[in-house]
Curated annotation (Swiss-Prot):
Function (record text): Part of the ABC transporter complex PstSACB involved in phosphate import. Responsible for energy coupling to the transport system.
Lineage: Bacteria, Bacillati, Bacillota, Bacilli, Lactobacillales
Protein name as it appears in the record: Phosphate import ATP-binding protein PstB 2
EC numbers on record: 7.3.2.1
Molecular function via GO: ATP binding; ATP hydrolysis activity; ATPase-coupled phosphate ion transmembrane transporter activity
Entry keywords, A to Z: ATP-binding, Cell membrane, Membrane, Nucleotide-binding, Phosphate transport, Translocase, Transport
Domain ABC transporter: 6-247
Binding site for ATP: G38, P39, S40, G41, S42, G43, K44, S45
């Protein structure tokens, strides 16, 4: 059986001593899309951000338990969080391109890491924008401001910015919730194509999105992991009443 790329063991997350995640244990596997679903406040985004230690940015956040990435304890004092977030990248709910050109957005992380060779940067821009399925739409205006793009294009440029740093895992926190249906569909198609090269963890409020593109789905409620299975099993044969109530719209 395939070894998990990320293992979470007995994870609890607190904000100012209030528990947001309660003793969660689960594994994530390479080259899959795993959807995290649940009502607002269920803990799914908190869990996502615990994986690459984004919670460190909140002084009121405390974490207990373990998160392992490729066998390494993410919360070890020896962990370099900059390197960690390069390998486990993140795309947020609202498109957040920097106020600079499309080109400079994509190479931002590479420049921070000291890469100056124009040929290397040019190649990274083209490959990353192609990977994010937006190259054909922007290739003739790479030096225009990314802020002039549509919301869907901006979000795909943000995906490209993550891809340029060569991550192994991509965390996505409701990446289509601020987009129109056509733009959301393009993002979904992009994510589905990326799973052959990356591991993707997707927080979504859309049951249809989870069922369309994910291979596994986890259902959270009040900080608890209620159910975790293949997406097909989750939607066709849920094992818990709370899961069934949520995916059928009785709980939300």
């Amino acid at each position: 059986m395939t070894e998990p790329i990320i293992s979470i063991n007995d994870l609890s997350v607190y904000f100012n001593k209030k528990k947001a995640i309660n003793n969660v244990t689960m594994d994530f596997y390479p080259n899959e899309i795993t959807a995290l679903i649940g009502p607002s406040g269920s803990g799914k985004s908190t869990l996502l951000r615990s994986i690459n230690r984004m919670g460190d940015l909140n002084p009121e956040c405390t974490v207990t338990g373990a998160v392992s990435y490729n066998g390494h304890n993410v919360y070890s004092p020896r962990t370099d969080t900059v390197e960690l977030r390069k390998e486990i990248g993140m795309v947020f709910q609202q498109p957040n391109p920097f106020p600079m050109s499309i080109y400079e957005n994509v190479v931002y992380g590479l420049r921070i890491n000291g890469i100056k060779d124009k040929a290397v940067l040019d190649k990274a821009v083209e490959e990353s924008l192609k990977g994010a399925s937006v190259w054909e739409e922007v290739k003739d205006r790479l030096h225009d401001s990314a802020l002039g793009l549509s919301g869907g294009q901006q979000q795909r440029v943000c995906v490209a910015r993550v891809l340029a740093t060569s991550p192994k895992v991509i965390l996505l926190d409701e990446p289509t919730s601020a987009l129109d249906p056509i733009s959301a569909g393009k993002i979904e198609e992009t994510l589905y194509n990326l799973k052959d090269q990356y591991t993707l963890l997707l927080v979504t409020r859309s049951m249809q999105q989870a069922s369309r593109i994910s291979q596994r789905t986890a259902f959270f409620l009040d900080g608890e992991l209620i159910e975790y299975s293949s997406t097909k099993d989750m939607f066709l044969n849920p094992q818990h009443k709370e899961t069934e109530d949520y995916i059928t719209g009785k709980l939300g």
